[in-house]
Curated annotation (Swiss-Prot):
InterPro entries noted in UniProt: UPF0270, YehU-like_sf
Family as reported in the entry's similarity comment: Belongs to the UPF0270 family.
Name assigned to this protein: UPF0270 protein PputGB1_1339
Signal peptide: none
Species whose genome carries this gene: Pseudomonas putida (strain GB-1)
SUPFAM superfamilies: YehU-like (SSF118001)
Lineage of the species this protein comes from: Bacteria, Pseudomonadati, Pseudomonadota, Gammaproteobacteria, Pseudomonadales
Domain of life: Bacteria
Amino acid sequence: MLIPYEQLQAETLTRLIEDFVTRDGTDNGDDTPLETRVLRVRQALAKGQAFILFDPESQQCQLLAKHDVPRELLD
């Protein structure tokens, strides 16, 4: 299920994004400051280039690029 980012509390959204951008394998040796990486994800969410996917089975949220979201969820 896709969760509109606007429906999350500001602090919750920030923590979700920070968790995503600081995970192993997401920085690829990039020394970009955390604030910049968070801003980029916020912009991608606002432009519809990224989405928050909630899996009710695992009770986990994921941030996905639009091309990684199952097509049936975008319709």
